[in-house]
Structures are given as C-alpha cells and as structure tokens.
Amino acid sequence: MSNYLINIIGPTAIGKTSLSIKVARHFITEIISADSRQFFKEMKIGTAVPDKDELAAATHHFIQHISIADAYSVGDFEKDAILKLKELFNKHKVAVMVGGSGLYIKAITEGLDDFPKVDPEIRRNLNQHLEEDGIDWLQKKLYVLDPEYYKTADVMNPHRLIRALEICIETGKPFSSFLNQKKPERNFKNITIGLMADREMIYDRINKRVDLMIRNGLIEEARELYPQKELNALNTVGYKELFSFFDGKTDLETAISEIKKNTRRFAKRQLTWFRKDPEIKWFEFDENSKNIFDYIESKINT
C-alpha cells in the first residue's frame, strides 16, 4: 500500500495554513511545515506562524523548532523532514506538507541536487561584496553568470544569491546546470495542491496581512530582534525594512510600504517557480474544501 504526501503550495497570504489544517483533519494526519522562516522561535508575527488555535487543530512539525542563531540549511531540513515522514507513515497512510518555498518543498518531494564543494575563500569574497557593494552587485553578477536561474531565484535573499554564485564561480558552470539531476527515490507518492487567485486579489490579501501584522506587534517584535539584525535569518521581508527604519534610513510609513511591495514581489517569484511544475493541481483560494478532498481521494484511490 502506497503512502501519500499531500503538498499544499501557493503564494504567500493565499490561505495555505487554513487549507492544510482542513486536509490534515479530514485525513486524520499531521502537518510538516516547509516554511523556512517559520522554523525560528524568535520570528512569530513577521512570518505568520499559525496561531494557538491553528496549532491545536492539527499536529504541526518544524514550527519554531530552532533559534535564529542556529545554522540550519535546506539540506538539514531535508534530512530531518524525511526522518519525520518515515515516523508519520508508520501511523498514517498520508501526511500533509505546507509551504511557499519551492526549494524546501522540492527538497522533500524530489530530493536536493548534488552540488560540489566550494572554496570558502569564494564565499568570503562574495560576502565582502555584499557588505561593500550591496545586494545589487550580487543580483547583477548572478544575472550575468546564470540568467536562467535568475528568472526564478529569490533575488532579495543574499544567502541564496551567494549560494548560487559560489557554485558558478567554483565550477565555471551555471548553478542551474546542477539542478534536476537524478534524485534519491522517495517511498511515497506526491499529491500537490496549489492555491491561486488573480493578481489583484493576491496583492490585496498581502496588503491586509501586513496591516494585521503591524497591529499585532510586528514593530515591537522587530525591535527586540534589532540587535541581531546581521543574522541571515533576519534578512527577511518584514524585518529588514523595519531595521532600516530603526537605523533612521527611512520613515515608518515608507518601511511598511516597502514590506508590502517586497512581499508582493516575493509572491510573484513563488508563482513563477510553481507554475513550472505540471504536477500541481490548481484550485481557487476560496474553493469548496470538499472538492479538494474529493480530488485528493481520487488520486489516492487510483
């Protein structure tokens, strides 16, 4: 009998958390969170961590389980999540995974690509360029060395940019050429549900979510984390814009506007990534849950 991993994906603020809980409750199973920023204990409001009622409605894994000071890569997540899934599949026929990061979803559904080791000096040089020349320098460099990967990369994330660039520089080959190599086999089948809406609706939901975060205390949360702003985990939309405000580089109104703008850009990149996957079954964000359950059951019973 096959095991099934039900993946709930889509752009930020589309309603993935709510649907994942409904699916988990319907199939009496548990949820793997693949949202890399919700891993961190100290980042709650700005990452839209499920609230107490949502966490109580279904068992979640990989929510606020590490500190922002911890080194935790997508490779670490792959190993930990696969072990957790083995445990879950001993109890359940299906499990649910939810998230908006295509890379973290792919790490579990397909496995990570095998990248060569990189000379640490290359990474140091790239970090120095980031410090002295800013993220724009990294973006332009990646566009030149690997325009194909640039199309879908999270170009506002310097950690991801540096990772791609160091592979390009070390090997002389595009980072994208190492993607989609033969992966380890998985002992489960994937059923992937994508939530979508028109652009205006997505942007409206994002703007309202940011306003809610501000009302719920995001500014205070960011202020507490400000002394640690150099940590990679905090180079995240919702925090870095407020850090600029605390630094006196901008006013609060502009910072909040930048959070909304950068979140909208992030949603656009998420959709660009996911739309390449023909295996995703797309539903409108307000689709009747029963129709989604029926689709999942039809795939399981095929």
Swiss-Prot record:
E.C. number: 2.5.1.75
InterPro entries: Dimethylallyltransferase (IPR039657), IPT (IPR018022), P-loop_NTPase (IPR027417)
Catalytic activity entry: adenosine(37) in tRNA + dimethylallyl diphosphate = N(6)-dimethylallyladenosine(37) in tRNA + diphosphate
Record bears the keyword Nucleotide-binding: yes
Keywords: ATP-binding, Magnesium, Nucleotide-binding, Transferase, tRNA processing
Region (Interaction with substrate tRNA): 35-38
PANTHER family the UniProt entry points to: TRNA DIMETHYLALLYLTRANSFERASE
UniProt name for this protein: tRNA dimethylallyltransferase
